[in-house]
Amino acid sequence: MGFQYKKVLLIGATSGIGRALAERFINEGSYVIAVGRRKEKLEELVHKYGHDKVSAVPFDITKMNAIPAFATNVIGTHDDLDCIVLNSGIQRKVDFSKPEEVDLDVVNEEFVTNYLSQVAITKAFLPFLMKKSNETALVYTSSGLSLVPILRCMNYCASKAALHHFVLSLRVQLRTTKVKVVELFPPAVQTELHDAKHQPDIKDGNKMGMPLDDFIEETYQGLAGGFEQIPIGRSKTSFQAFEMKRQEVFSEAVKSMSGGEIDWTPHGTVPQ
């Protein structure tokens, strides 16, 4: 089974996981609409692969008031869009044992980027996706840290936990539609997310974690396999240890609160 979607809107495509996923989709035959803040990075992608395989849309997703117009523009230009990958994310150190050093503007920016903008994008594109006669997909890059936090980036973990809970509920809410809801759970991956520019307190941060090529290969195989929840690398440990059981409890709660009308189970949504 191969990746079935032919036109992918990839938000956060300028570097790291997003850039590598964009290139993998292109190489596998999907057309990619690459979105990000850094126009020059998007243009590099178009120059490398050509306009017949990729297009660039510079956009800052933290400008939330502009998201509806952004969605209208994309839909108007690409009415055959069938997959949206929401991959944008930032990670910053926060230490509340030194409250005088905590910058709430940074805390807010991280939450807007990693969670609130993703909710706004979902709302903006869902009416279009739900009207399509063919299956479409929303793919969210969550994190293994949405399941088990670490101290140094507590707000990042909280933002990803919020996204995870949103996605889990969204999947059930959209169960009767043709919109598939997919969540990726990356471990630490060797990208610029941890480099000296973005997190100077981490030594050799861009060498920390799973090699990017290995991550992309495992991720793509999960996507091509049609799975809805894809823990990768070390994230599998947390997912297998307790997350499946927690989702069973969630499933029971959903069934109970719906008077038995909604019978959803997480089994079969995850690679074994």
Where do the language-model regions lie?
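Residue(s) in the substrate-gating loop at a strand-loop-helix junction
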Residues: S143
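Conserved glycine-rich Rossmann-like NAD(P)H-binding loop of the short-chain dehydrogenase/reductase
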Residues: E28-E44
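Rossmann-fold cofactor-recognition segment
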Residues: Y49-N65
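SDR active-site lid
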Residues: H165, R171-R234
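Active-site helix of classical SDR
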Residues: T122, S159
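Conserved mid-core segment of classical short-chain dehydrogenase/reductases
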Residues: P68, I75, I90-N108, R152
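Conserved glycine-rich cofactor-binding loop
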Residues: T14-S15
